[in-house]
């Protein structure tokens, strides 16, 4: 319990009290951080920290592992890196120059720890930035996996799940073209779960892609396999049973 609280709150010089539910959340996060989550696409574990989205459902990572890379592909950016898992998959594919960004100090610390465990710190650089790094250099591949639900987060820990008014999704799509090399690709990972809940229209993402001056080169789809898909008692079962996660490979529409 002491370790769990220290990881979230840091060193405290005074006594304090916590709601039991909050304490249990800290302890649960500590256990996940300690044992890690096995990522099939890496054949290794990723260790999430408290408040950083845990890649428990890793089907989308298999898409990143197998999708055709741009040619050439000398550099890649991972926008909103979180645990760093996407950067790790790209590094495993052989990319030597990867730049990973996030706004959250917890996520940056988490990603750094995972990169050190995986021995890829020479391949990946971390930058604290809102979406794109401040650099004049363009990238051959820019990957983003924004939160999938366009709703307001009630707590900081929910920011990895909810993207209020689709701000991150829109910010990525409408600005990524200025950061791509001439033959580069932008990869968007997005579930249609929000569509099945009536929170997003089926045309919203294609319309954003067109507005951004991009076109779809290829689209890879995968159906989730996590246990909630089979749980008929789940209030969201119907939407989960229909859900598809897609990797949109986008290029400049020239």
Where are the regions a protein language model picked out?
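Conserved SAM-binding loop and adjacent beta-strand
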Residues: 29-31, 49-65
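N-terminal auxiliary segments of SAM/dcSAM-dependent transferases
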Residues: 1-37
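Conserved SAM/SAH cofactor-binding pocket of Class I
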Residues: 57-144, 150-154
């Amino acid at each position: 319990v002491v370790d769990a609280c220290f990881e979230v709150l840091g060193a405290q010089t005074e006594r304090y009290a916590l709601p039991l539910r909050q304490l249990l959340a800290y302890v649960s996060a500590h256990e996940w951080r300690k044992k890690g989550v096995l990522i099939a696409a890496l054949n290794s574990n990723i260790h999430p920290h408290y408040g950083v989205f845990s890649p428990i459902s890793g089907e989308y990572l298999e898409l990143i592992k197998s999708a055709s890379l741009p040619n050439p592909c000398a550099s890649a950016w991972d926008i909103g890196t979180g645990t760093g898992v996407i950067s790790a998959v790209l590094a495993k594919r052989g990319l030597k120059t990867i730049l990973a960004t996030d706004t959250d100090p917890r996520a940056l610390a988490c990603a750094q720890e995972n990169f050190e465990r995986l021995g890829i710190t020479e391949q990946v650089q971390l930058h604290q930035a809102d979406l794109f790094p401040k650099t004049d250099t363009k990238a051959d591949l820019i990957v983003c996996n924004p939160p999938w639900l366009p709703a307001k987060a009630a707590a900081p820990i929910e920011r990895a799940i909810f993207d209020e008014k689709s701000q991150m999704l829109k910010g990525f799509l409408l600005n990524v073209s200025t950061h791509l090399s001439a033959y580069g690709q932008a990869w968007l990972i997005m579930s249609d779960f929000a569509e099945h809940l009536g929170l997003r229209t089926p045309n919203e993402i294609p319309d954003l892609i067109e507005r951004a001056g991009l076109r779809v080169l290829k689209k890879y789809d995968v159906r989730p396999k996590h246990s909630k898909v089979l749980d008929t008692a789940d209030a969201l079962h119907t939407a989960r049973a229909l859900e598809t996660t897609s990797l949109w490979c986008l290029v400049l529409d020239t």
